[in-house]
């Protein structure tokens, strides 16, 4: 919606935004060209065909499969860099992510890819299936992260709890403290 408009990007940066995320690589290119120095996140899982431009313009990518991760790892190798990924876990919305009972397996596979950094886990609610974010859904994500930590030995520091639909949960004080990122800004 904002299409990486420079004035809006500056307003976000001046207001304390610590990262800019977008679902379109072209907009992330504009973010980079704006020179804010903020890390960027690609919200749409990249296809193997656009993995190279995803790695070039985004610091982080949300992914839902080992196949996407493999494509990003190859692209990062070709670019001579590391790329950070957030593995999405579907805790009920039926839109994106690996099932909780497969998360350890998928995260373990991804952790072996040489040119990726596994930043953490995320989820998306109140989108396709209309599942409302709750403290219980967030705790489910926290539990999956703990299982993945134990299996891989990785910190998985980033725990992205969802989008703007999570704001009521945050405002009510019911958001678990382990959730340290929300992707705010619905279209």
Annotate each predicted stretch with a short phrase.
Residues 3-6, 10-11, 15, 83, ...:
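Active-site loop/helix belt of alpha/beta enzymes
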Residues 25-30, 67-81, 130-140:
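Active-site-adjacent beta->alpha loops and helix N-cap segments on the catalytic face
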Residues 56-93:
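A generic, well-ordered mixed alpha/beta core segment in the N-terminal half of proteins
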